[in-house]
Every structure is written in C-alpha cells, then in structure tokens.
C-alpha cells in the first residue's frame, strides 16, 4: 500500500531544473488562463508594456494583463517538456529559447533545443532547431582574413543563454556555440567573430591569425574563453555588448569590429571575466554587468558598473554571484544566488531584502536563490518582478527601503477551485523545506488543519479555528514536525482541513528524509 501511495504522489511532483552557470564546456495552441506560471523555478523575466514573459523550468509563461493571469506553454507539441533559458521581444515577436539536461556517462549535460517564436501573442509558433555547424564549416571569412573555426556539431553544451536584437538581426549567446546572428528570423545563422584571448580588439582590415574555438582539441591547440557566449545587450547608443567567459566585448558597428574589456587590460577593470548578465540602466544609460570569477587568480565575484560605455568600471557587491538587475526611478536591484539587494545611491551602498513574506497568503518565500528581475513603472504602479528557485514574486515598490508589499505566486502544478486542496512540494524533506498546503474556500470562515500519520493518529494541529477569506488561494505550511517539535519519520501522512462553512478537505503528504 505504501508503494502505491508513493507512486501517486511522485507523479505530481514538479520538475526543478535549474539553469547552469558554469562554462565547462508552425502549429496552433489553445491555452486556458492559469493563476500562476507552471513552475516555481523562474530563470528569465522580460516586460513589454502590460505583457510579462517568464522563462521557467517548465516551459514559457506569458501574462498579457500585468500578471493577473497566465498562459503556460509546456507539455505540448511546440514546447514539449523543455525548460526555457532565454526570452526576448522585438517588433511584436515573442522569442523563447529552450533546453534540457541529457545524461551522458552519469553526468547531466546542458543541451540546447533551439528557439520558438510567435508573431500573434502565442497563438501560433515557429520552431527553430538549435544552431549547429556542418563538420565542413571550418573557416570564416572576416574582412581580409580567412579565420579557422571549430565546427560546433552538437547541441550538448550548446544552448542559448541570451537573446538580443539589432535592427533586423537576431543575436544569440549559445555557450560553447559562441555568439551567433541571423538576419532571416532564424532560418540561417552566422558565427560572430570575437577577439581571441590574446587580443583586445579586432576589425576586418586587421591581418589576423587565430582560430575561432572555445576548446583545444584535434582541430587546434587554442582554447579561447572569449569564444564561449553568455550574455548580450543592445544599448540605447546602438552599441552591442557580448559577455563571454573571457570578458565584455563591445561593438559600435553592428557586431563587426570589437573591443574587449577584461580583468587585466584596464586600469579600472571589471571584477571577473565570466559575464553572466549585461544590462543598461534606462535612466542614466550606465552599463551593469554580473562579473563572476573565471580562471584568473586575482578575479573575484561582484557587480561591475560603467558610466562611460566600458572604458572604466566600478565594482560593487564583492563576493556576490549576481545573475540579473532591475532598475526603478530611485533604485537599482541585484539578484544573486544568495540574496536580493537594493541600492539607492547608484551602487555605493546595498541593502539586502528582508525575509520575503506574503501577508495575505500567509506564506514565506522558501529560498535565497534569486535568478531574474524586471521592473514595470508608470504613474500608478511601480512593480519589481522577481524570479527565484522558489517561485515568482511581485513586489509593489514602497517609498523607502524594502517597505513595499510582497505577493508570492507559487505554482502547485494544478488549478485550485473552491473547496479544493493540494500539497506541494510532494514529496518533501523537513530538513530543507516546508510542505505548503494550498486550498480555497467558497466563502469566509474559520479553518482548522490537522496532520495524521498512516494509522490516523494525530501528529500535529497546524491551524486551529483561524479566520480565512473566501474565493482566494490560501496557503498554510507544515514544517514536518510533531507537537513536540520532533521531525517526523519517513512515510505517508494525511492532512485534514475543517472549515466552518463547508465539507472537510483531505490530502496526502509524503515525507522523505
């Protein structure tokens, strides 16, 4: 019997596939609106007017009404069961890059599965395969030069981390596949030639002798970290910024000529050469980069900021592994793997966010790993959207530091209706997580929640005659402990929700230590 319960419960678990950060190397859909994105692992956020694009471990989520409802694209003939690693929007077209892990000889290898784009707000999609090279594509004409180029013939370690747009060109950063561009909506792709590790700048009229390749091997001995693509930005100046494992490359002629900035070639340099993100503050046009330690002994993790396009840099938040930035009229926000930070003085001073708590739902964000940021501001609303490994968060920015209202959007993988319930994550481990019991009432009432073991013995009363509102999603939590505060043993447990205005609700929770 216990084995049967285990199978039923495991079938409801939502995948939590996190986008890796290392550099080792046309069909119609009909979608119902959901209350939240389908996954709690949020890797990318982009906002265009009232539209919010969210890349998750369970496909793409789109809101066309500022986050009030969501259309989720996952487990269908277009997105299948792929995760989304990058999102973009240009001239009415929505773009999403997809990926997954493949197990090779016992190791999980990040593998690209291409792009999807829609010109009609997600009603129809075009699928673009992951760009790879023909084995014979071993050279590139660059100005007066014929550059040797390692053909990238596999999708493994070749997945799209970022998307940018320049005029009618789509640019992608594809990890081991480098930086690529397309001028025909992804039908064909060309490799972008960046400086090798031993050169700080290149232009087509230079006489050059190097290979475009990220790793050494049978093709040649060169292994250029600057040919591993991670991040992209098209700034308001029209300059293109390309972040790699070897620094920040800047082009002022549409991606033809490049100047490279790294930790060693400037008097006031970036902190590290592994560039996970590049963003522009739209208010003062400053450039912000998530600059991680790569291979240099003196490199360090930090945020690097430039007021002059990259000629010199200021370094902030030393030691933090930042993944994204958000900008409001009064503040700069940084999302790191160990916290969320706000600065009101252009980066000189940073303040960590307090424990994030949704007062209305009575839930606390169960992670410190922040992945993505985007802001929405107009005369009536100032909103910071936050992607984490524990859900999507909407923060209504307040008048002082972290004084606003938090709204945590947790996905359960199922839609809730009146007088229904669901527990997640399920299974869960009390030493690292809490079990969220999500339910809704048809009307206001008092609620009691009890936990029972497999023999129907009372383990803990989680809630006793607590007042709860009707017609909204409610979440209360069980920490996996009994009335004495001891962590319970492995096994199946049952919850019972009694209400003053309806029939009891029941469900199962599997505890695994």
Regions found by a protein language model. Give the residues of each.
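C-terminal tail/sorting-segment detector
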Residues: 492-513
């Amino acid at each position: 019997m216990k084995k049967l319960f285990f199978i039923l419960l495991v079938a409801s678990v939502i995948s939590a596939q996190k986008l890796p950060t290392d550099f080792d190397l046309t069909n119609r859909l009909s979608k119902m609106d959901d209350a939240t994105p389908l996954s709690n692992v949020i890797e990318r956020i982009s906002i265009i007017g009232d539209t919010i694009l969210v890349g998750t471990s369970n496909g793409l989520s789109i809101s066309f009404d500022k986050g009030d409802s969501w259309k989720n694209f996952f487990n269908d003939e277009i997105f299948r069961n792929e995760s989304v690693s990058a999102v973009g929007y240009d001239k009415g077209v929505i773009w999403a890059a997809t990926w997954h892990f493949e197990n090779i000889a016992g190791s999980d290898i990040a593998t690209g599965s291409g792009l999807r784009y829609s010109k009609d707000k997600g009603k129809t999609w075009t699928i673009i395969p992951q760009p790879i090279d023909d084995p014979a594509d071993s050279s590139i004409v660059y100005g007066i030069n014929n550059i040797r180029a390692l053909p990238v013939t596999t999708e493994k370690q070749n997945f799209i981390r970022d998307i940018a747009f320049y005029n009618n060109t789509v640019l992608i950063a594809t990890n081991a596949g480098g930086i690529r561009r397309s001028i025909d909506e992804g039908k064909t792709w060309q490799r972008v030639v960046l400086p090798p590790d031993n050169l700080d700048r290149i232009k087509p009229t230079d006489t050059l002798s190097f290979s475009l390749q990220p790793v050494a091997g049978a093709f040649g001995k060169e292994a250029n970290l600057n040919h591993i693509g991670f991040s992209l930005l098209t700034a308001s100046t029209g300059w293109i910024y390309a972040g790699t494992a070897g620094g920040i490359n800047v082009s002022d002629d549409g991606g033809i000529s490049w100047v490279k900035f790294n930790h060693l070639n400037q008097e006031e340099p970036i902190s590290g050469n592994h560039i996970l993100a590049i963003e522009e503050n739209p208010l003062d046009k400053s450039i912000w980069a998530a600059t991680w330690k790569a291979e240099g002994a003196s490199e360090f993790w930090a945020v690097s900021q430039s007021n002059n396009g990259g000629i010199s840099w200021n370094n902030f938040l030393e030691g933090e592994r930042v993944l994204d930035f958000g900008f409001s009229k009064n503040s700069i926000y940084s999302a790191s793997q160990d916290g969320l930070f706000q600065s009101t003085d252009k980066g000189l001073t940073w303040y960590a966010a307090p424990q994030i708590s949704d007062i209305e739902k009575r839930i606390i964000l169960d992670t410190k790993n922040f992945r993505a940021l985007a802001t929405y501001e107009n005369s009536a609303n100032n909103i910071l959207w936050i992607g984490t490994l524990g859900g999507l968060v909407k923060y209504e920015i307040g008048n002082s530091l972290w004084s606003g209202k938090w709204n945590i959007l947790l996905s359960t993988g199922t839609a809730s209706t009146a007088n229904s319930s669901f527990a997640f994550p399920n299974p869960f481990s009390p030493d690292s997580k809490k079990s969220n019991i999500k339910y809704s009432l048809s009307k206001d009432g008092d609620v009691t929640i009890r936990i029972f073991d497999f023999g129907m013995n009372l383990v803990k009363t989680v809630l006793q005659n607590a007042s709860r509102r009707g017609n909204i999603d409610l979440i209360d939590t069980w920490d996996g402990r009994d009335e004495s505060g001891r962590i319970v043993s492995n096994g199946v447990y049952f919850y019972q929700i009694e209400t003053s205005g309806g029939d009891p609700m029941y469900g199962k929770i599997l505890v695994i230590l």
